[in-house]
Design a protein with these regions (language model features):
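Bacterial N-terminal signal peptides that target proteins for export
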Residues: 1-10
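N-terminal signal peptide c-region/cleavage motif recognized by signal peptidases
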Residues: 17-19
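N-terminal secretory/targeting leader peptides
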Residues: 23-116, 125, 130-336
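Catalytic cores of large soluble enzymes that bind and process phosphate-bearing ligands
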Residues: 122
Length: 336
């Protein structure tokens, strides 16, 4: 009788584990990103939830926020190798692997509203070509979405372009971003996001660029008190999965992955506009930061310098010129 009870217990355990009657155990899936407690992290969580839900538990997806799986560059390399299933990443951090995707970082390129940024990427011929190129590098881009426009957060007041000249700013390691700051006479420095708070606190850098939500949720206003609205750069994100991993999935699960990613982008558009407005209002209300607008004449100077500088440089770059041309065609079509 004891033997029967023992085997009954074993059989029940196996059934619970999904290893009998042809059932397959759930596949563990990790989705990484570099920030925490902000809209980007919330979208990571939603993507993971949708993967699990739409697959009826066949994919057991978990979000890993705050850079717990490594830096953006480390996660991207791991994803290309197939050891990380998915991630959410600023397109500028993809420039080392897919230089063409970094062209979303060209200054004064996209409209400022997050949903309009997303709409632009959906309609964009350049974006479609970027996705094709990324596929060849082992990266499947489900889609792009906009977080919002980036402006300047500094340790000192900024009322004119001359105020930032000679000053050290942290930028994403993307040639268009670095080029923009060089055009303005500032000094760009590439740095992982996890290092930014301490670097600002210690004065290793004196400024950064980011949308209000990131600045507020990551508490960067504690170490840099001046937010100057320039809205010079669009912050475009990508939802990625490993091509190697996706291609090995059954056809129905491949479709689940795409559906979950696209629905996560829809969710992103719903929350990002509100997140930016709420963060800016909160910082103003708390008096934790001085918010001002860069004068229009100074913005024109910045734009003109970029058009003669980094834009021309990227147009003349053999690897990037075709994408820049497509982007210019996209802009003309979008705003006609």
């Amino acid at each position: 009788m004891k033997a029967i009870s023992k085997w009954a217990f074993v059989a029940a355990s196996l059934l619970a584990a999904g290893t009998v009657f042809g059932q397959t155990p759930a596949m563990n899936v990790l989705i990484g990103n570099s920030t925490a407690n902000d809209a980007q992290a919330a979208i990571n969580v939603r993507f993971a939830e949708l993967l699990t839900k739409y697959s009826n538990g066949r994919l057991a997806a978990s979000s890993r926020t705050g850079g717990s799986l490594g830096t953006n560059s480390q996660m991207l390399s791991t994803l290309q190798a197939g050891a990380l299933q998915g991630m959410i990443i600023p397109t500028g951090f993809m420039a080392s692997a897919v230089p063409e995707i970094g062209m979303f970082d060209l200054p004064f390129l996209l409209p400022g509203d997050p949903a309009k940024m997303t709409e632009f990427t959906v309609r964009s011929k350049a974006a479609a070509r970027m996705r094709e190129i990324a596929e060849q590098k082992g990266i499947h881009v489900i889609g792009f979405y906009g977080i919002g426009s980036q402006s300047l957060l500094t340790r000192f007041p900024v009322t004119k372009l001359a105020d930032i000249q000679g000053k050290l700013f942290r930028v994403i390691p993307s040639p268009p971003r670095a080029g923009a700051y060089k055009d303005w006479g500032a000094v760009p420095r590439s740095m992982d996001f996890a290092e930014v708070y301490t670097a600002l606190q210690q004065g290793t850098i004196v400024g950064i660029e980011n949308p209000p939500d990131v600045i507020y949720k990551m508490k960067l206003y504690e170490v840099a008190k001046y937010f100057t609205r320039t809205e010079h750069s669009a912050f475009v994100m990508a939802i990625l999965v490993s091509k190697k991993w996706r291609d090995a999935l059954p056809k129905d699960l491949q479709e689940v992955v795409i559906r979950a990613g696209k629905d996560a982008i829809t969710y992103a558009d719903e929350i990002n506009t509100k997140a930016q407005a709420d963060a800016l209002a909160a910082m103003r209300k708390e008096g934790s930061i001085t918010v001002s607008d860069m004068p229009a004449a100074e913005i024109r100077k910045m734009r003109d310098l970029n058009r003669e500088g980094v834009w021309k440089s990227m147009k003349n770059d053999p690897q990037r010129s075709a994408i820049v041309k497509l982007l210019e065609e996209d802009i003309a079509d979008y705003f006609k």
